[in-house]
Amino acid sequence: MLTCIACTKQLNTNNGGSTREEDEEHGVIGTPRTKQAIKSLTSQLKDMAVKASGAYKNCKPCSGTTNRNQNRNYADSDAASDSGRFHYSYQRAGTATSTPKIWGNEMESRLKGISSEEGTPTSMSGRTESIVFMEDDEVKEWVAQVEPGVLITFVSLPQGGNDLKRIRFRSTRFPYYRDQLLLWCRQGWVFWPQNCREMFNKWQAQKWWVENFEKVMELYNVQFNQQSVPLQTPPVSEDGGSQIQSVKDSPVTPPLERERPHRNIPGSSGFASTPKLSSISGTKTETSSIDGSARSSSVDRSEEVSVSNASDMESEWVEQDEPGIYITIRALPDGNRELRRVRFSRDKFGETHARLWWEQNRARIQQQYL
């Protein structure tokens, strides 16, 4: 049987002896019954410390004026001890269940502060935290799918509008490329599937861009960034599609001016390898044209806007410089000549060969025909 420390009193004698406090004050502690009670209390304290540490703190103190016998005193002490254990265990359980609630309230208050763009409120434990919002200075890119298999990457400009960064033509539009099947392209009597695959894929991509240039410019509010650097040729992607990166001033695009281009420009310039009817041979041949616009006068090229109409067609003519090379020349009202385009026959020139020839003979053509 365990007794409560606060309830432990010296047992009253039959003749109305003094209490334990009175004995301590007078120094009267030496009777056998008192020593036995002290030993019993010491052993009980050890058991309480091991089994139910802290239970005695919740025990109610007993009044010192009430006289009880030994059995009643021990019974009351046991009941108080059991009650203290139960109360202590209940208190510990309540503390465990209330901790998540307190933590939940703290997190909820922090989330409310974040959502309202305020500082994090002071937590219940006294800690404070601050949230720093950093502005994103990186270039924002986004991709738009204009048609199935045609993906255009735009860059949002700080002053408004979008800059066209990349056009990608996925090979899913042409299932034969994706499956890596043979593409029959006759070059003489020899078939070159790999070379023909690259040429035909670029031809499809360039044709689509010439036809849909104005629609993309108007629909996506494209305003080219002056710092963009164009590439010479649109590279072929890993999946068989072609990419046109930084299409500003690229040979595949119509001439870009500060004003919006006219409707008839796609047919008049650009590296458009669409089938054309040659005015020299009179037969339908696939030709690739390079915009070789160059004027002998000192007029700025950016201020020149070429519009194809009936009067322009009357002042233009075609000359054959070499077999398979056709040069279109136009006479200007001021008496000067303008080199409109140079066309190469597909039967004799590939794209790389045509560009190399033009770089080597550009000065000669301008001096000879202009």
Curated annotation (Swiss-Prot):
InterPro entries: Brevis_radix_dom, BRX-like, BRX_N. Residues 231-316 are annotated as: Disordered. PROSITE patterns: BRX (PS51514). Keywords: Nucleus, Repeat. Disruption phenotype: No visible phenotype. Expressed in roots. It is found in: Nucleus. GO terms for cellular component: nucleus. The keyword Phosphoprotein does not apply. Residues 140-221, 315-370 form the BRX domain. The keyword ATP-binding does not apply. Pfam families: BRX, BRX_N. Residues 231-248, 266-291 have a biased composition (Polar residues). Belongs to the BRX family. This is Protein Brevis radix-like 3. It comes from Arabidopsis thaliana (Mouse-ear cress). The lineage of its organism: Eukaryota, Viridiplantae, Streptophyta, Embryophyta, Tracheophyta.
